[in-house]
Amino acid sequence: MSGVEIILSQNIDKWATLNLNLNGYQNIVEGFSVVNLYPQENTFTANRQEILSGSIKFNGNFRFKRKFELQLTSVYLAPDIVPQGKIYSRFSIDLGVKKLIQKDKGEIFLNATDLANTMRIKRTVQGDGFHYLSTDYYETQVVRVGYTYKF
């Protein structure tokens, strides 16, 4: 596997910082053969697969009046290959807010991951005599509320 990564960061005055991470790579799964002996002897052969894939991640940090901050993150993962198949593209958006209190020694925060519930792993797998399409739903939507204090 070989690839390239580009990271861009920009401060917008004192109120915002924007970051963009671009990642591209060539993924190769070499062809292979395997002999399964159980329950009966069966030879499986997979052809060589190759794909150009990558990801994009955007992160924005925004500072507002009264020590209030907001963070927005979005992630796109391009289609990729696995032995015997393919993983389709995935996307998610996360959001977090925090408020500094107690002379900046404490903070109250709220964050939520995968707001649109789009981080599903859809894949196809195929082989000699079978083909299936699946979508895995992990528990990616999480909301956290908390308080921290710095001594």
PLM ranges: what are they?
Residues 1-75:
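Gram-negative outer-membrane beta-barrel transporters
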Residues 3, 67-69, 90-94, 105-107, ...:
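Active-site lining segments that contact anionic ligands and/or coordinate catalytic metals
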Residues 4-10, 58-62, 95-99, 110, ...:
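Residues on the lipid-exposed face of transmembrane beta-strands in outer-membrane beta-barrel proteins
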Residues 8, 42-48, 60, 81-85, ...:
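Outer-membrane beta-barrel proteins
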Residues 24-28, 74-80, 112-118, 151:
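Transmembrane beta-strands of outer-membrane beta-barrel pores
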Residues 30-41, 73, 81-88, 121-127:
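Outer-membrane beta-barrel translocator domains and adjoining extracellular loop/strand segments
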Residues 48-52, 87-90, 137-139:
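Short sequence motifs at beta-strands and strand-loop junctions characteristic
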Residues 99-151:
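C-terminal beta-signal and adjacent terminal beta-strands/loops
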